[in-house]
Amino acid sequence: MFGFLLKKNFCDGWDNLLSVVIVNVVFLFAGFGVVFLNIFARATDAILIKILAFTISFIVLSILAFAYGDSAAKIANFEGIHILDYFKAIPGVLKDASLFGLLVSVIILLTTFSIKYYFTQSESMFGFMLGAAIVWIDVFIFLSLIWFIPIRSLMHNNFKKCLKKSFIIFFDNTGFTLAIAVYNLVLIALSVLFVGFILSIAGILIANTNALRLRLYKYDYLEEHPELATKKERKHIPWEELIYDDR
């Protein structure tokens, strides 16, 4: 199944190259903007301004990423898209994207403070262990959040349900999620080579949405076969049969 996923991601990216490039250019310029915003904020002595600039940065980038979610879902479902769909989608994602950006920024800020305190200032073994636990919790959270935008785009759930399902998908498909995380890191590395014009956020969203769409076949299959009761039986999914119509 993973081999087919890689092939589909490449074909979908190539067939929608113009939209991928346009979205990535918008995201790239926004990225430059938030970098300058944070540089300006760091030049001040006001901690509140620094935190505010940091939070606004994640909210803005989240809005631009979420806006491409519906287009990525259409691409994953073999539907055509229009360039203007991306910009038209922005008003509809403002609430969820802002909450997501706020959530991520709060997690990062709390983690930064915790690591600074427990690893550098706390001299006890308990403090070190607590700091390590926080790091691992963050790893689980961010691995789960890989699925947030694809879940929202494919299932059209509200923020709370998307968050809940993100963790369910992660813990039920931990190995697959780790593979997708590594794949995302590879895409990010390749994006740097292409100066962010190709692959980048649009390519990653297409890849993750394709991954979730194919993975959901597993749950359709298990629902149709309630006799597969044990964990061992539920692991044997006939992927070649399930993705046959997509080939």
What does each of the following model-derived ranges do?
Residues 1-120, 127, 144-147, 151-247:
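Helix-coil boundary and N-terminal low-complexity module in membrane systems
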Residues 129-141:
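Alpha-helical transmembrane segments of multi-pass membrane proteins
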